[in-house]
Regions:
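Amphipathic alpha-helical scaffolding segments comprising HEAT/armadillo-like alpha-solenoid repeats
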Residues: 2-9, 30-42, 64-81, 108-124, ...
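Hydrophobic/aromatic-rich structural module bridging two neighboring secondary-structure elements via a short loop
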Residues: 69-100
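Short coil/turn segments at helix-helix junctions and helix-capping linkers
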Residues: 41-49, 82, 86-90, 165-173
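N-terminal alpha-helical scaffold/docking segments in eukaryotic complex subunits
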Residues: 1-66, 215-229
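Histidine/lysine/aspartate-rich catalytic loop segments that bind and position anionic ligands
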Residues: 114-152
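Alpha-helix N-cap/helix-start positions at coil->helix boundaries
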Residues: 17, 33, 48-49, 89-90, ...
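Conserved hydrophobic register position within alpha-solenoid helical repeats
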Residues: 23, 54, 95, 141, ...
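Structural signature of alpha-helical solenoid repeat scaffolds
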Residues: 59-62, 100-101, 142, 146-147, ...
């Protein structure tokens, strides 16, 4: 039987493999519960592609775990939530993205946890909320909501009002990701604000379909407005 260290090496070899399509399939040859730890480590990797492949891998592994034993998958989801809690002492890098990816691939987990993901971008005047103040974490939450919206727009729709506020954020990546999410939700009430961003040439990076690409807020705003019909 492979040791935890051996499995971590195997997981990272797959995440770093030039043939990632094949690597994804090989993840299932490993004991899934022992894959989870290395995947959490991958979310902090200095190589952005390894981090994003880790996110993708979570979306493969945890739904498979849920189908076999729902409580084991819930434990993983609760670990993400704890990592984003101030009391955890950690940062929670990659946690919102992984949550969104998992929920896009498993309806029951999405039903249980989508509101938690959406509330990460909801700020109240009292401050009694789970709003993520760190812009990089908030980017992750908006990307996660956009990924959820790709598969389950009706669940992501609860974030519509907060996403419209994000369209005015000073962070260009947040503005672009909000457009992506709102377009997928088909949020007609966001049309006028997104139309204002059609001339926003700010550059940003976007992960999707297994690749990191460069795009602009303008491109994402234009696509989102077009999606509204």
């Amino acid at each position: 039987m492979s040791s935890g260290r051996d499995i971590k090496r195997e997981v990272f070899a797959l995440l770093e493999s030039p043939d990632w399509d094949q690597g994804q399939k090989k993840l299932f040859d490993l004991p899934l519960q022992k894959v989870v730890g290395p995947l959490f480590s991958s979310l902090c990797n200095s190589n952005p592609l390894v981090k994003w492949r880790g996110v993708t891998a979570f979306g493969l592994v945890v739904p498979r775990m849920a189908d076999a034993a729902m409580e084991k998958a819930r434990i993983v989801m609760r670990r993400f939530i704890w990592s984003l809690n101030d009391e955890s002492g950690g940062i929670g890098w990659g946690a919102p993205e992984a949550m969104g990816e998992i929920m896009a691939n498993h309806e029951k987990l999405a039903g249980e946890y989508h509101s938690i993901l959406c509330f990460y971008i909801h700020e109240t005047e009292s401050g009694e909320d789970t709003f993520l103040e760190h812009a990089l974490l908030r980017r992750g939450a908006v990307w996660g909501i956009a990924r959820l919206a790709q598969a389950r727009p009706e669940m992501a729709a609860m974030a519509t009002e907060d996403l419209i506020k994000v369209l005015k954020d000073e962070d260009a990546t947040l503005r672009g990701l909000a457009c992506l999410a709102l377009g997928r939700i088909r949020a007609g009430e966001a049309r006028s604000e997104m139309e204002k961003l059609v001339q926003d040439s700010s550059l940003m990076e976007l992960f999707g379909d297994g690749k990191i690409t460069k795009t602009t807020v303008s491109d994402l705003a234009r696509e989102a407005v077009a999606a509204l019909g």
